[in-house]
């Protein structure tokens, strides 16, 4: 059998039911990761988002939120995560009751993260910080995937389908862009990708965004715009300093743009499969 179980939460609006809304102390949680003035060298839509529209007709400025208020938001978000965890537990318990636990591959991941006050912003959008695009993944299959192992290789969501098909003994269909993660799970240290590409067409913002993330650098390209983003992930893991205009990183920027263009071409929609000689 195959079951795709998709949960909307955790997601705004942050309104978990009881008792989940009261599980976490807002004042005991870490303050958001941010630095005064960090958005000065970012593209203009970052600063525009500081006074974003909420889920009413009222506009508000995120800069006016206190650490306690950010903690309240994070506590609600954590409560929603616990709500989902508990219900995933119900699924796992049902598999165990039916004797299917050891013969079922379970893969858990998400589609994106949440700003939660990091960099002074909330929700999501065309801001490709790690807190939004670095998605965790848990894979469980007793006897096949080593329990308790951790892997740090670069992968993408498009790799999920080829991975499941390989474990099921099925050849991926023609034109699939992803690569199976099975070699990584078997312990191959050389497996994985050099870069991960993130795409976001934010038409209501008038932006088409593509980001290339590697171990050392991250580049974000905005189609038709003169601005962009470049981060040194080793020197600036919090992504506070945008190096797009830094001439000393010009060669890195050019190299990353070329790698991004290569990837865009590689992932174009495939032509129909050729079945004849001419």
Whereabouts are the PLM-identified features?
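Active-site-proximal cap/lid insertion segments
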Residues: 1-154, 167-175, 221-224, 228, ...
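Hydrophobic alpha-helical membrane-association signature
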Residues: 84-87, 160, 256
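C-terminal cap/loop subdomain of S1 sulfatases and analogous C-terminal strand-loop tails that border
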Residues: 112-118, 145, 156-161, 166-233, ...
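Solvent-exposed, non-membrane alpha-helical residues enriched in polar/charged side chains
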Residues: 89-92, 96, 182, 241, ...
């Amino acid at each position: 059998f195959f079951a795709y179980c998709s949960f909307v939460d955790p997601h705004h609006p942050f309104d978990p039911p009881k008792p989940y809304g009261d599980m976490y102390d807002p004042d005991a949680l870490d303050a958001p990761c941010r630095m005064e003035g960090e958005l000065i060298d970012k593209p203009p839509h970052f600063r525009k988002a500081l006074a974003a529209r909420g889920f009413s007709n009222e506009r508000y400025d995120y800069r006016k939120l206190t650490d306690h208020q950010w903690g309240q938001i994070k506590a609600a978000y954590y409560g929603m995560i616990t709500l989902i965890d508990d219900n995933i537990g119900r699924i796992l318990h049902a598999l165990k009751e039916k004797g299917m636990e050891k013969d079922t591959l379970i893969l858990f991941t998400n589609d994106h993260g949440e700003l939660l006050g990091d960099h002074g912003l909330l929700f999501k959008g065309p801001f490709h910080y790690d807190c939004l695009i670095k998605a965790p993944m848990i894979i469980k299959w007793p006897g096949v995937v080593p329990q308790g192992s951790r892997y740090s290789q670069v992968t993408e969501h498009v790799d999920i389908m080829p991975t499941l098909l390989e474990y099921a003994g099925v050849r991926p269909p023609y034109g699939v862009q992803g690569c199976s993660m099975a070699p990584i799970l078997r312990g191959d240290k050389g497996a994985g990708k050099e870069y991960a590409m993130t795409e976001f067409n934010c038409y209501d913002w008038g932006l088409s965004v593509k980001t290339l993330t590697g171990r050392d650098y991250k580049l974000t390209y905005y189609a038709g715009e003169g601005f962009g983003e470049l981060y040194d992930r080793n020197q600036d893991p919090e992504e506070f300093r945008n190096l797009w205009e830094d001439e000393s990183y010009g060669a890195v920027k050019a190299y990353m743009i070329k790698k991004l263009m290569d990837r865009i071409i590689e992932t174009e929609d495939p032509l129909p499969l050729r079945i004849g000689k001419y």
